[in-house]
Amino acid sequence: MFLIFFLFFIMFGFISGSFMFGRNFLSFWLSLVMIIFIVLCMIFSFLMVSVCLYGYYYYDFCLILMLDFCFIWLTYVCSGFYMFIMLLINMVFCFIVFYAFYYMYFDMLLGRFLIIFWIFVVCMNLFILSYDFLTAYCGWELLGLFSFFLISYFWYRFFALKFGFKAFFIGKIGDVLLIFAFSIIFLSNGFCMTTFYFLNFFCMDYYYIEFSICLLVGCAFTKSTQFGLHIWLPDAMEGPIPVSALIHAATLVVCGIILLSFVYWCFDFWFSYFYNLIGWSTLILILMTLCVFYNFDVKRYVAFSTICQISFSMFCCLCIDIYIGSLFFCYHMFYKATLFIVLGIWIHIFFGLQDLRCYFFMYFCGCVLARLLLIFAILNSCSIWFLCGFYCKDMLLALLMLLSFYNIIEFLFISIIFIFFTMIYNYFLLFFLMFVFKCFCLVDCLFLLFDYECCLVYCLISLYMCILSIFFIIDFVCIFVFSSYCVFWSFFLNFYNFFDIAIFVVFLILSVGFLYYGCLFFYFFNIDCIMLFWRIFFVIIILVVFMIFCCWYFVCMIIFMLLFVWNFVIYFRYNLKYCLFFCILWILYV
């Protein structure tokens, strides 16, 4: 019955598309996307209403489809968790396809692009619904193949073809690891035990289990851009903007997390095995934040931001909870696709210019909606109150407060550093897109500072960072650490070693040197952070961050006070609304 209604909707959409968009090639594609989007919205609304009425147990279902091709079984499963992810990915795909019509309208090979685009999304859906090793491997291979076609779509450009092959060959590393892991599991369990949920790990040797899980994690790292295997993602930005919005926001970068979610139930037995990922995730977080600060290419900027977000999602999936990590990349795909589309519009307007420092005249292009979408995406990434990012990170911190195990301090430290770094590099992007013109033009500085949306967003982010830093100082340091975990500190003081003391001395020397040059946070990078020396410096680093932020806000308050006095004396009789606006700024900073 559902297929009959779906075919009816497709026929109706094709007829209506012919009348609405004209009898041309785009009629079929636009009508098909519209109908699929309507059906997805109906299904998603039905699921949300069902959850509100019957609770989350409504998602506890599992539909299995088994296909027999000459004794070769292909098994697909549809559960509530994977159906929810698939609906979100397809909704993002529909939005990106509408933008792709605008972006690729004058391309001679638009039909080929749309066909590859659709096949890529179908392969992603097949990979999400896969239930055994063969279907998962087929979906994994097809995703790598068609991602190469999309990244190197402008094959006549040398760098597009080169970076497409680079992404393809790095993906082949993951394919080899996946084949090895599946071969070990097949040989140890028997060829009849092929599904993910019926692996007979009790019949396997412990070293085989450990080695196969290590191979699966390494395979997931190739797609989810962890440290050492992340080099393909910034270079893959040579493809079209719709390809970057789909691959780097919603599909290819989350394949590793989805692969690990298939066998997540067996990770509980080796939880301590992933303890080293704490230092690994922090290393790539600091490294990619530094790359963001020293990179002025817009597309590469978003790529490095994607690496930070996906690496933290992988860390949450492996070390905390699979559903928290999945929630992170679900909200990430929406705001990151929005960010790609908005930046793609500005790249079109500025004739292919991608240098972030040259966007200071964006206010004269008239893209009001694009500016509002950019502000909304940045505020969502910064986790401003009552947005999706705020609820995700609040749920993460609440879960960490409820948990109690020996490495909770490291988890809290990574979460706090991730939140702070996210706000810092998003403020960096906001500064270059909205404030750089005010800094470099000294003719009429007061006029340029009277931009309501920019100043309001700046005040909101600054106030949020100040309150968040105060919250971390009071709650985590004074209450959480010294009250709830005094036993942990006494245990650590009894069992410290010489290597921790050596790292402490090195850190003090580096801190003094960086503080002398005034670049403590932008140049801080030490490979020894893998060794988890956070226990000693947790309180010190938070206090330093708090003092720096307090000094920064004090300077900003004095500057705005001087601007307010100057504006009040000079422009009072002409622009009363500007005086009122600076009164609001003064109240916020006080």
UniProtKB/Swiss-Prot annotation:
Keywords of this entry: Electron transport, Membrane, Mitochondrion, Mitochondrion inner membrane, NAD, Respiratory chain, Translocase, Transmembrane, Transmembrane helix, Transport, Ubiquinone
One GO location term (cellular component): mitochondrial inner membrane
Record bears the keyword Membrane: yes
GO biological process, one term: electron transport coupled proton transport
Catalytic activity: a ubiquinone + NADH + 5 H(+)(in) = a ubiquinol + NAD(+) + 4 H(+)(out)
UniProt keyword annotation of NAD present: yes
GO molecular function, one term: NADH dehydrogenase (ubiquinone) activity
InterPro entries: ND/Mrp_TM, NU5C-like
Annotated compartments: Mitochondrion inner membrane
Membrane topology reported for the UniProt record: Multi-pass membrane protein
Enzyme Commission designation: 7.1.1.2
Enzyme class: translocase
Transmembrane domains' residue ranges: 1-21, 28-48, 58-78, 81-101, 113-133, 136-156, 176-198, 245-265, 273-293, 310-330, 333-353, 372-392, 395-415, 428-450, 461-481, 501-521, 536-556, 568-588
SS bonds (residue pairs): none
Function as written in the Swiss-Prot or TrEMBL entry: Core subunit of the mitochondrial membrane respiratory chain NADH dehydrogenase (Complex I) that is believed to belong to the minimal assembly required for catalysis. Complex I functions in the transfer of electrons from NADH to the respiratory chain. The immediate electron acceptor for the enzyme is believed to be ubiquinone.
UniProt-listed PANTHER family: NADH-UBIQUINONE OXIDOREDUCTASE CHAIN 5
Protein family (similarity comment): Belongs to the complex I subunit 5 family.
Protein name per its UniProtKB record: NADH-ubiquinone oxidoreductase chain 5
Lineage start: Eukaryota, Discoba, Euglenozoa, Kinetoplastea, Metakinetoplastina
Gene that specifies this protein: ND5
